[in-house]
Amino acid sequence: MKGRSLNTEDRARLEAAIGYRFAEKERLDRALTHSSARSGRAINYQRLEFLGDRVLGLCVAELLFQTFTDANEGELSVRLNQLVSAESCAKVADELSLHEFIRTGSDVKKITGKHMMNVRADVVESLIAAIYLDGGLDAARRFVLEHWTHRAASADGARRDAKTELQEWAHAKFGVAPKYRTDDRSGPDHDPRFTVTVEVDGIAPETGVDRSKRGAEQVAAMKLLEREGVWQKRSAGN
């Protein structure tokens, strides 16, 4: 959807899909507006995304704390990182068909492929913030629980920390320690993307991308463990 605001029919369809009716319709419009759609720092979803990331983290952390009463802090952190990742948020966006409503500008071609996944994830966080501002924490929590409760139940929390697992596996199999290299940092300060490569002597490296350097290291370690058959690869539905 290039440029234009939601019409009455589209707004009703989207509000029905997300299960929330906005009192201030402009909040929903802003949550769907990519920075390419208009000039001006206050018209797009970037500020909402910043807030929505924190609201999502709080609601999911609360869900995990109440659900997995015997899990320690490390196990809860692994689950949390899985559930609030860009990949998970993008899947929620796909379930809601948010791509049909995202407002973009003339440089829409710049947000295709992997970056488009990040855009879909960002819009979900922006939408959570818009709901929070419009209806309060309870409304935002209801949305998060609707779309993350089943994901929390299926998240592979039995896994250990990927970097720790890779460290022990690499030492036992090759007698070496993994080496991590930061290849790239992109994106604005409030929403960076780190690309990290992990190398273990004797086998091909793997690369991970995440919003934090540590998260990217975890993704790279996880991908290497899955590729080498140390961990079973997660299904696409989780």
Swiss-Prot record:
Any one annotated GO CC term: cytoplasm
Keyword Ion transport recorded: no
GO biological process terms held by the UniProt record: mRNA processing; regulation of gene expression; rRNA processing; tRNA processing
Enzyme Commission number(s) from the entry: 3.1.26.3
Active-site residues (renumbered): 53, 125
Keyword terms: Cytoplasm, Endonuclease, Hydrolase, Magnesium, Metal-binding, mRNA processing, Nuclease, RNA-binding, rRNA processing, rRNA-binding, tRNA processing
Catalysed reactions, as listed in the record: Endonucleolytic cleavage to 5'-phosphomonoester
Chain residues that bind Mg(2+): 49, 122, 125
Pfam family, one: dsrm
Subcellular location: Cytoplasm
Major site of localization recorded for this protein: cytoplasm
Domain DRBM: 161-230
Cofactor needs: Mg(2+)
Molecular function terms, GO-annotated: double-stranded RNA binding; metal ion binding; ribonuclease III activity; rRNA binding
Top-rank EC class of the record's enzyme: hydrolase
Span of domain RNase III: 11-136
Entry's family note: Belongs to the ribonuclease III family.
Summary of the function given for this chain in its UniProt record: Digests double-stranded RNA. Involved in the processing of primary rRNA transcript to yield the immediate precursors to the large and small rRNAs (23S and 16S). Processes some mRNAs, and tRNAs when they are encoded in the rRNA operon. Processes pre-crRNA and tracrRNA of type II CRISPR loci if present in the organism.
Assembly: Homodimer.
PANTHER family reported for this sequence: RIBONUCLEASE 3 (PTHR11207:SF0), RIBONUCLEASE III (PTHR11207)
Name of the featured protein: Ribonuclease 3
The species this protein was found in: Rhizobium meliloti (strain 1021) (Ensifer meliloti)
